[in-house]
Design a protein with these regions (language model features):
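C-terminal motif of bacterial Sec signal peptides marking the signal peptidase cleavage site
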Residues: 15-18
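Bacterial N-terminal signal peptides that target proteins for export
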Residues: 1-7
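Active-site-proximal mixed secondary-structure blocks
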Residues: 20-201
Length: 201
């Protein structure tokens, strides 16, 4: 009988000790898909041609009080003057052009395929005519520098403008010159931005 009582006592002590240790352990930190992870520009592991041309990206400029966004397929990633850069092309006719001219920074964000219809919408309407944030249903977030990215995105690249230059129609191949003439639209401006921050999910 005494042996049973001793055994039960030892078991209870071990059980209490085990529970006490677990109570003192720090909770495990979990990373969810809703949490941004900061990475280096060199760690952007994507096919840039596919990301722009096929999947599309969302270009945004401005601050929380006044901003605009548009879907883009013309662009690229690379290096200039020893800096990692994003290059984009925006027509002077686009409403976003005004925001690019007035602000020092811009962002480009990529989205999962399920948001394709949102990008289609954002590339087909103008912020002059309607509230594109409300119409798209996307959720703007703002970086420490005050620039817009989106909760639904899975890659966000924040850029500081380095250089801007309108494309020269006289230097274009004939086919491209005719394209601009037929569409009767403003020429595209090339913007090169230094990548200052990158986040992914």
């Amino acid at each position: 009988m005494k042996l049973k009582q001793i055994a039960l006592g030892v078991f209870a002590a071990l059980l209490l000790a085990s529970c006490g240790n677990k109570a003192n352990e720090p909770e495990a930190k979990t990373q969810t898909s809703d949490t941004w992870q900061e990475i280096k520009p060199q760690e952007i592991d994507v096919n840039a041609v596919k990301m722009f041309a096929d999947d599309w990206m969302l270009l945004s400029a401005g601050k929380d009080t006044s901003m605009n966004m548009m879907t883009i397929a013309w662009g690229g990633l690379g290096e200039l003057w020893g800096k990692p850069v994003v290059t984009i092309y925006v027509s002077t006719d686009r409403y976003t052009y005004k925001f690019l001219e007035e602000n020092e920074y811009f962002t480009v964000t990529a989205f999962p395929e399920q948001y394709r219809d949102k990008l289609q919408y954002l590339g087909s309407v103008s912020g002059r005519d309607e509230d594109k944030v409300k119409g798209s249903g996307l959720t703007p977030e703002f970086t420490k520098l005050g620039n817009p990215i989106y909760k639904e995105a899975n890659l966000a690249i924040e850029c500081k403008k380095l250089y801007a230059e309108p494309l020269n129609k006289d230097l274009m191949p004939l086919e491209q010159r005719q394209w601009y003439d037929e569409k009767k639209q403003g020429v595209h401006v090339m913007y090169i931005g230094e990548i200052v921050n990158v986040w992914k999910k």
